[in-house]
Amino acid sequence: MHPSILKYLPHRPPMQMVDTITHINDTSIVTSFQIKEDCILLDNGYFTESGLIENMAQTCSAIVGQFFFDKNDEGSKHVIGYISAIKKAEIFDLPQITQTIRTEATLLSRYDDKEYSICAMDCAAYYQHHLLATAQMNLFIKEND
């Protein structure tokens, strides 16, 4: 059984752009997301560039976010996170409604303070074996009391 993404992200619909975690450890993650008709980041039947970036950011943040929650928590802690920098992003293609994308991310570096974490990540989004997008981004995540 895969862990619930709700444990590791503060996002909820309609801004939740990850459905399932298929693999996670301390330094890498693989997620999936089915693009549905009610997705707010669609344009003419295609998932937008912004949607791909948000999907990759949410996938990345779950790696670090897992350490802010205990095993029994179902997203009740108040954790905030945001992209602090996108060093490089390339969009090669856009997926369509009903397609399921797979997103893979790897932690490159991480700095932890008492109240927050800053991390650098590499990520890529795919439809089947077709590369849709890549990015390297920095994320800032902290518990919001």
Ranges and model annotations:
Residues 1-5, 103-105:
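Short Pro/Gly-enriched beta-strand edge/turn motifs at strand-loop
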